[in-house]
C-alpha cells in the first residue's frame, strides 16, 4: 500500500509538470495569484500600470431555471473594471454566442435590483482559443459595435477580445500565448508568471497545493452527486438515494475534470481507477451536449 501511494503521488506530480496554461484547470490555479493575474492582464490590455484589486477563479454564477456558468478567471482592477479570461481548446460551434451568454451572466450578477444600467461595470472578455477562431491569420480580434452605414461606434461597455495561441504576429500577446502553450517551468521570460508556474510545477509546496486543489475538485463533484442522489432518495428510498449519489459523484467529478481539459490518463491517475473511469469518460466525450455547466 505504501509503495502504491508513493507511485500514485509520483504519477500525479508527473501529470502536474505536463500541464500548460491552455488547461483552464492549471490556468485557474496559476492566476488565482494576484501578481501573476496582473502580469497577464497588463499584457492583454497593453496597460503596464494596471492594478488588480481582486481575483476569483472558477467563479460560479447560478440562476434558477437557466444555464449555469463557471468563469475561469474573474478579476477587478482599481478602477472597478471587470476582466474575464476564458480558455477554450475545443474547436466546436457556438463560441461567439457562448461569449454573449457569459457577458449577460456577468452583467446580471453585478447589477443589483433597483440600480441604474449606468452602474454596470466596464467589462473585458478575453476568449483564448487554441485555434484561429476567425481563420483570418490574426493573433487578436478586438470586437467593437458599430453602425453598419457610417461605422458609428455604440459602446455598451462590453469589450470582446478573441485571442489564439496558433498565429504568431511577434507581438507581446503572441509571446505570452506561446508561453501558454509550452509553459516550461525553466522559462523565466515572463517574470512573476514564470515564478508562479515554477512554484506550482517544481516546488514541494506547489505540487502539494495542486494536489489539494485536485482533491477539492473531487470533493465538489462528490458533494454535488450526493446532493442529487439524496434528493432522489426522498422518493426512492434513502439507501438507494445514497448509492445513486455516490455513483453520480464519480460521474460529476469525471465530467468536471473533462470540462477542465484533463484527458483520460490524467483523470484515471487522479481517481486511481481505469475501468469505470474509461466507461464514464467515453460516454461524456461522445455525449451530444457536454456543456450543461461551463
Model regions and ranges:
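Accessory alpha/beta interaction modules
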Residues: 1-158, 169-171, 294
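Short, charged alpha-helical interaction segments and adjacent helix-coil junctions
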Residues: 2-17, 21, 25, 44, ...
Amino acid at each position: 500500500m505504501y509503495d502504491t501511494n508513493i507511485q500514485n503521488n509520483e504519477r500525479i506530480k508527473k501529470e502536474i509538470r505536463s500541464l500548460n496554461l491552455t488547461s483552464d484547470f492549471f490556468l485557474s490555479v496559476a492566476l488565482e495569484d494576484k501578481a501573476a493575474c496582473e502580469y497577464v492582464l497588463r499584457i492583454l490590455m497593453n496597460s503596464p500600470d494596471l492594478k488588480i484589486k481582486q481575483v476569483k477563479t472558477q467563479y460560479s454564477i447560478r440562476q434558477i431555471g437557466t444555464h449555469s456558468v463557471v468563469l475561469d478567471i474573474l478579476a477587478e482592477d482599481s478602477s472597478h473594471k471587470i476582466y474575464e479570461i476564458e480558455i477554450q481548446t475545443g474547436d466546436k460551434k457556438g463560441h461567439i454566442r457562448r461569449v454573449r451568454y457569459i457577458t449577460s451572466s456577468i452583467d446580471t450578477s453585478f447589477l443589483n435590483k433597483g440600480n441604474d444600467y449606468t452602474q454596470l461595470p466596464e467589462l473585458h472578455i478575453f476568449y483564448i482559443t487554441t485555434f484561429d477562431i476567425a481563420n483570418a491569420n490574426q493573433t487578436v480580434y478586438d470586437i467593437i459595435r458599430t453602425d453598419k452605414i457610417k461605422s458609428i461606434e455604440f459602446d455598451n461597455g462590453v469589450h470582446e477580445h478573441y485571442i489564439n495561441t496558433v498565429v504568431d504576429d511577434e507581438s507581446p500577446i503572441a509571446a505570452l500565448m506561446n508561453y501558454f502553450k509550452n509553459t516550461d517551468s525553466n522559462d523565466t521570460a515572463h517574470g512573476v508568471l514564470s515564478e508562479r508556474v515554477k512554484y506550482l510545477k517544481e516546488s514541494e509546496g506547489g505540487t502539494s497545493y495542486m494536489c489539494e486543489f485536485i482533491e477539492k475538485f473531487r470533493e465538489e463533484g462528490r458533494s454535488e452527486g450526493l446532493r442529487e442522489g439524496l434528493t432522489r432518495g426522498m422518493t426512492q428510498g434513502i439507501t438507494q438515494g445514497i448509492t445513486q449519489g455516490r455513483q453520480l459523484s464519480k460521474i460529476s467529478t469525471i465530467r468536471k475534470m473533462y470540462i477542465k481539459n484533463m484527458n483520460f490518463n490524467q483523470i484515471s491517475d487522479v481517481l486511481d481507477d481505469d475501468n469505470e473511469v474509461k466507461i464514464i469518460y467515453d460516454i461524456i466525450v461522445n455525449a451530444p451536449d457536454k456543456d450543461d455547466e461551463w
